[in-house]
């Protein structure tokens, strides 16, 4: 009982001591100021205009996420397009992400950045890609079936052994002279 009480007191002391050692800047370690967080969902046209100005957008282009309780607030709903689709030859302020300073980022930028999902249109339509894939698989299955039904073997000659075809090792009479075996070389 005394050991358990000492253990609890030791843990409580350690928690109190660690609170005093924590650096003061630990609260702002995320580098997100309160100005960067989305505000409440805009209900009036004036609030929409203020939110559009906050995100450097025109009022006509600004559309917030729906207020469904996910916590998006007044953050603008940007098109679901990856950074691959943006012009690679433009002089971006941040070329790795293809973003300019002050430009709103997509809420799911970590998914749509250049290392992840590429939403660029493909040069071949989806049904053509499926036809090519399943056509190749069907052809390979057909060829495996043909190879199974009609097996092909490498032609071979009879096995050749040295010393007159292993005459003595195969039980030949040592007093007789074995007949000569001609070995062929290719």
Curated annotation (Swiss-Prot):
Quaternary data: Complex I is composed of 45 different subunits.
Organism placement in taxonomy: Eukaryota, Metazoa, Chordata, Craniata, Vertebrata
Per UniProt, the keywords (alphabetical) are:
Electron transport, Membrane, Mitochondrion, Mitochondrion inner membrane, Respiratory chain, Transit peptide, Transmembrane, Transmembrane helix, Transport
An example GO BP is: mitochondrial electron transport, NADH to ubiquinone
This chain belongs to the protein called NADH dehydrogenase [ubiquinone] 1 beta subcomplex subunit 8, mitochondrial
- Transit peptide extent on chain: 1-28
As for membrane topology, the entry says: Single-pass membrane protein
Query: What does the UniProt record say this protein does?
Result: Accessory subunit of the mitochondrial membrane respiratory chain NADH dehydrogenase (Complex I), that is believed not to be involved in catalysis. Complex I functions in the transfer of electrons from NADH to the respiratory chain. The immediate electron acceptor for the enzyme is believed to be ubiquinone.
Q: What is its main location?
A: mitochondrion
The GO cellular component terms are: mitochondrial inner membrane; respiratory chain complex I
Native source organism of the sequence: Gorilla gorilla gorilla
Compartments it resides in: Mitochondrion inner membrane
Q: Where are the transmembrane segments?
A: 133-153
């Amino acid at each position: 009982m005394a050991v358990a009480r000492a253990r609890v007191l030791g843990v409580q002391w350690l928690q109190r001591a660690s609170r005093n050692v924590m650096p003061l800047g630990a609260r702002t370690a995320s580098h997100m100021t309160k100005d960067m967080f989305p505000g409440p969902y805009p209900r009036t046209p004036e609030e929409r205009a203020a939110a559009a100005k906050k995100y450097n957008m025109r009022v006509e282009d600004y559309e917030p996420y729906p207020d469904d309780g996910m916590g998006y607030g007044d953050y603008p709903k940007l098109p679901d397009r990856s950074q691959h689709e943006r012009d690679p030859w433009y002089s971006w302020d941040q070329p790795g992400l293809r973003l300019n300073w002050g430009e709103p980022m997509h809420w799911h930028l970590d998914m749509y950045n250049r290392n992840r999902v590429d939403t660029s249109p493909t040069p071949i339509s989806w049904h053509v890609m499926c036809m090519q894939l399943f056509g190749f698989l069907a052809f390979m299955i057909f060829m495996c079936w043909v190879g199974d039904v009609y097996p092909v073997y490498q032609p071979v000659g009879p096995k050749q052994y040295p010393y007159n075809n292993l005459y003595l090792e195969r039980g030949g009479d040592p007093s007789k002279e074995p007949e000569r075996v001609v070995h062929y070389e290719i």
